[in-house]
Amino acid sequence: MSGTKIHPTALVEKGAQLGENVFVGPFCHISSEAVIGDGCSLMSHVVIMGKTTLGADSKVFSHAILGAEPQDNKHKGGYTTLSIGKNCTIREGVTMHRGSDSSVGMTIVGDNCQFFCYAHIAHDCRVGNNVTFANNVMIAGHVTVGDYVIIGGGAAVHQFVRVGHHAFIGGVSALVGDLIPYGTAVGVQAKLAGLNIIGMKRAGLERKDIHALRHAVAMLFDHSKPFKERVSDVASFYPASQSVVDVVNFIKEKGKRFYCTPKFEGDRIKENKD
């Protein structure tokens, strides 16, 4: 614990593991099972509950509560965990719950993530690396969020939904179906509105890859054939495009929810200029 500073008003329970150069601010409460990585900073009134691991160089702001029991009536109080990766920024009032003993028992958050004020991550979620949740984002239990996803303020995600990597969800949207990688979903009842072109460019996709994915996703949702045939056609048409392969694999790994699709039957994905 070399270089670690704990404010005299903070309560660090016996058994808690704190790394080097950790700062624990006024009125924080850290549970006996918590593991706090090197270089972490906990500002005032942060609560770390249960078996919660916070990765190195993460910063947690006032009144965040990490590792509380899940809000799940099936949970019977068993041993469950919350794991948060390194270099995460967790702003004021954020809540993240441990997994439930009626499911996988683990809530997992990746590295380099940003969670703005009052965002909520429920039990048994898996959140990837480099994601950004704006203020008041709420994701329900068992949700999977891929790498580099951005979710706008006030958006909500239904339980068991999968959000593919590099996807974007607009503010105050309610996503109730699986969103494909690179997809953009907007609306109070969110629909697939196009592709996250900015995210694709940030990911280093070349122009040819972007155009291939545009065409592939338009094929998927043109409703001219049964959906399984459309998926097969896309896979055959673009076997060398990794972005298309990612979308096809995402669809084949079907979860418990339906897919987020365009608004009207027969609508195509917008062929926006880049």
From Swiss-Prot:
SUPFAM superfamilies: Trimeric LpxA-like enzymes. It comes from the Bacteria. GO terms for molecular function: acyl-[acyl-carrier-protein]-UDP-N-acetylglucosamine O-acyltransferase activity. Pathway: Glycolipid biosynthesis; lipid IV(A) biosynthesis; lipid IV(A) from (3R)-3-hydroxytetradecanoyl-[acyl-carrier-protein] and UDP-N-acetyl-alpha-D-glucosamine: step 1/6. It catalyses: a (3R)-hydroxyacyl-[ACP] + UDP-N-acetyl-alpha-D-glucosamine = a UDP-3-O-[(3R)-3-hydroxyacyl]-N-acetyl-alpha-D-glucosamine + holo-[ACP]. One of its GO terms (cellular component) is membrane. It is found in: Cytoplasm. One of its GO terms (biological process) is lipid A biosynthetic process. Its EC number is 2.3.1.129. Involved in the biosynthesis of lipid A, a phosphorylated glycolipid that anchors the lipopolysaccharide to the outer membrane of the cell. Belongs to the transferase hexapeptide repeat family. LpxA subfamily. Homotrimer. This is Acyl-[acyl-carrier-protein]--UDP-N-acetylglucosamine O-acyltransferase. It comes from Bartonella henselae (strain ATCC 49882 / DSM 28221 / CCUG 30454 / Houston 1) (Rochalimaea henselae).
